[in-house]
Swiss-Prot record:
TM regions (residue ranges): none
Family per similarity comment: Belongs to the XseB family.
Known EC number: 3.1.11.6
PANTHER family (UniProt xref): EXODEOXYRIBONUCLEASE 7 SMALL SUBUNIT (PTHR34137:SF1)
Any one cellular-component term (Gene Ontology): exodeoxyribonuclease VII complex
GO molecular function, one term: exodeoxyribonuclease VII activity
GO biological process entries: DNA catabolic process
Subcellular location: Cytoplasm
Encoding gene per record: xseB
Protein name in the entry: Exodeoxyribonuclease 7 small subunit
Gene source species: Nitrobacter winogradskyi (strain ATCC 25391 / DSM 10237 / CIP 104748 / NCIMB 11846 / Nb-255)
């Protein structure tokens, strides 16, 4: 893949997506990017943010709390309620 062609957001791991998002935030905060490019990277940043949120939701759904009996023996699992 060419360096100037960004990867499809939907194929990125959480770690790669968050790393790219952090880079975009830094570039926008520096204020040295032309208007059109700023808009384009902002839009990519929004897509990356959505990707990260989706991956976090999926991970949260997979996290389970281990249940134990009175003596501390594992009896099973149940969905973790983080609310």
């Amino acid at each position: 893949m060419a360096e100037n062609v960004p990867a499809d957001v939907n194929t990125l791991s959480f770690e790669l997506a968050i790393e790219e998002l952090e880079t975009i935030v830094k570039r926008l905060e520096d204020g040295k990017v032309a208007l059109e490019e700023s808009v384009a990277i902002y839009e990519r940043g929004e897509a990356l943010k959505r990707r990260c949120e989706e991956l976090l939701r999926r991970a949260e759904a997979r996290v389970e709390k281990i249940t134990t009996d009175a003596s501390g023996h594992v009896t099973g699992t149940e969905p973790l309620d983080v609310r």
